[in-house]
Amino acid sequence: LNELMDLLAWTQQRNIHLILDESFVDFSEKSVENTLLKNEVLETYPHLTVIKSISKSYGVPGLRLGIAASSDKEIISYLRKNMAIWNINSFAEFYLQIYSKYNNDYQNACKKFIAERQRFFEVLQQVDFLRVIPSQANYFLCEVTSRFSSTKLVSLLLEHNLLLKDCSTKTGFDGRNY
């Protein structure tokens, strides 16, 4: 969090607008402390916009529900002006009506997930051809270091009904086996 606050101060001094995606912050070990989705932070740093996809946090891909928060009135005005008139579907509206009823269950599930993530990380590290990158999200990025290409490993595991994403063709990975 300290590094993020340093980056935020740096961007503020240079009049740079920072957009921070907190879609996976609920899975971090100290999610309440890690979030910048707080009025005092947003008011202190008007060049900050925090976005969060609810569908990623709650694992509901069709939900199409998210948050954008900023104290920059121009940004908020722009978003409101350019937002579709019907920007929420009935499923998302229903979710908002029942959200608070299940919030404690969700928080408990996140705590269990955090404990399980650590155990899973330790198991993955035992695979001799994987370099596992530590994560605070609900997934791990792994580099396949030998034995298979990432494409081949994804294909082999799919035969056992294990779904992985081959990131070797993604921008920034330069064809490496992730």
Where are the regions that the model predicts?
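Short beta-strand->loop
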Residues: 54, 163-168
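PLP-dependent aminotransferase class I/II
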Residues: 47-133
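Residue-level detector of structured alpha->beta connecting loops
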Residues: 15, 46, 128-129, 161
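Conserved PLP-binding catalytic core of the aspartate aminotransferase-like
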Residues: 113-114, 127-160, 176
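Active-site pre-lysine segment of PLP-dependent enzymes
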Residues: 1-18, 22-57
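PLP-dependent enzyme catalytic core of the Aspartate aminotransferase-like
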Residues: 2, 9, 159-160, 171-178
